[in-house]
């Protein structure tokens, strides 16, 4: 902020998804997910919060997941981190008392690098059966939802956007 003179918006989009079953005990992967998916959003939000409050406006877009709305076998820890993103979004919205526009986006199956981080064979098999790779849509569609949220004037707040392929079950 000191270098560039100001910030009007931030998109907290970093995330990892090494899905696994609880019984697999992949604690290191769970810790990494918590560090990136929760702490990353917290630290990014904190980096701009006071600046936005001082200037009287700002926009925060947090990327969660449909896994932050529904838990599936193998996604327990990942879902917990994405539920946390929603909680951070709601809390930030309340703490800013209408000064900061906070949007939480919940993408479904889109073409990204996330699935490559899954190492648990049982989870890979479950996901293959669900066929999510076949219905995944281009990530640009999520980018358009981010753009939509950022284009709103100060009088409008888009709180939540759930975006998923039509063929994907919620």
Give, region by region, the residue ranges found by the protein language model.
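Conserved amphipathic alpha-helix within the SDR
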Residues: 1-6
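Substrate-binding pocket helix/loop in short-chain dehydrogenase/reductase
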Residues: 21-22, 29-34
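Active-site loop immediately N-terminal to the catalytic Tyr-X3-Lys motif
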Residues: 23, 70-76
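Active-site helix of classical SDR
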Residues: 45, 81
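Residue(s) in the substrate-gating loop at a strand-loop-helix junction
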Residues: 65
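Active-site-adjacent segment of SDR/Rossmann-fold oxidoreductases
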Residues: 70, 91-100
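C-terminal helical subdomain
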Residues: 104-105, 124-169
